[in-house]
Amino acid sequence: MTSETSETVRSYDRDAAAYVARTATVPDSVRAALERLADRLGPGARVLEIGSGGGRDALLAEQLGLAVRRTDVTPAFVALLREQGHGCDLLDPLVDDLSSPDGPYDAVWANASLLHVARDDLPTVLDRLAAVTRPGGLLCMSLKEGDGDGWSTHGTISGPRHFTYWRAPDAEAVVRAAGWGDVVVRRGLGGDGGETWLELSAVRDGVSP
């Protein structure tokens, strides 16, 4: 984990309750993405979630019939979800074991989490996610559109968070290079209308499920 990522995790750790309160409502774009995922996978499909945060997305995914393994790199989020009665693993997708004793996952869901991964580390993370996803399994992830990287001290929490920004062609290329095919990129505005998000979906090995 880079020093920037460590500082970002500390910020989330300090402001976890505030973050959960401010992000409690599922945006329409996220709901639509989860509905597409559930429709393609079918009931009971196993999903690895990277960056569960307050658990909002996982709850909706389960309502849609999916089985979700919750994970986060921030201890406060993991503790919060466990207090609510959910299983949640403290997990860094860059270095920790992502596998499951039940075999490969049917999909990976990484909403607004991999944008904190350093540019040079994202290929490794995507490789590792592909390795634990079945052939034909799905990837859904979101990044912020832009150039370079930088710190933010505004938004859902006040503490400093480090973001890596991506242009669509570069994001698509790094996803493809990690063993994912049929990449689709959708653009959408954030909740405040001031930032453009990239929603990427892809298929493991380019095989339709």
Task: Give, region by region, the residue ranges found by the protein language model.
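A short SAM/SAH-binding and catalytic strip from SAM-dependent methyltransferases
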Residues: 106-121
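Short, glycine-/aromatic-enriched active-site segment of Class I SAM-dependent methyltransferases
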Residues: 144-162
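Conserved class I S-adenosyl-L-methionine
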Residues: 1-42, 147, 189
